Amino acid sequence: NFEEDPRVLLRTRLENSAGEMASDNLALNDVVLHKWLTARMIEFELWINGRFVESQRSDGIIISTPTGSTAYALSGGGPLVYPDLDAILLGPICPHALSNRPIMVSGSSTIELRLCGRTTANDVRVTCDGQTTLEMAADSRLLISKAEHPARLLHPAGHDHFKVLRNKLDWGGRRQ
């Protein structure tokens, strides 16, 4: 016997300056905008639901699903999020300002990233689940939102998410 476990997928669209779709990808864990072939920070604007949030100088940003909260996002200082929560996590990678902290937004949100400042296309890459790498032109936009359909995982009957966390994160067992 198996139990179905629907999980949020992220849809990542890269649009060029004319608004045409240059790339369309899915990610189960995370989408990462990160520096590439440079030792200096990158600079980008973060928009959520069409509203400007901030310009950030950092080594990048991790946009994660609740499933991905136990992966790269956790290593970057993000929270563990229960997998059936309808949320998207945003975690800066080595931000220049100590005020840049991880945040969590509604799963219905649309995240938009735009390069700014001296950051050029040669300075950054976008990686989806550590597998697909995209080049981002300086005048393009990266749009990240929840995919229309979830991933459907199957677990053996009686699956216990917290048991998985105890094993994966080496949490102590229950004291008798």
Short names for language-model regions:
Residues L33, N49-F52, R101-Q176:
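ATP/nucleoside-binding phosphotransfer catalytic cores, i.e., glycine-rich phosphate-binding loops
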Residues N1-D59:
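Catalytic core of DAGKc-family lipid kinases
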Residues N25-L28, I93-H96, D123-T127:
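Short Pro/Gly-enriched beta-strand edge/turn motifs at strand-loop
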Residues P6-V8, A27, R40-I42, R57-D59, ...:
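A generic structural signal for well-ordered coil/turn residues at beta-strand boundaries
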Residues L26-L28, I62-T65, A71-A73, L89-L90, ...:
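Short hydrophobic-aromatic micro-motifs
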Residues S55-D59, I63-S99:
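Gly/Ser/Thr-rich active-site loops/lids in small-molecule metabolic enzymes
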Residues L14, K35-L37, T65-S69, C94, ...:
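Glycine-rich beta-alpha junction loops
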Residues L46, G68, V126:
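Short aromatic-centered micro-motifs
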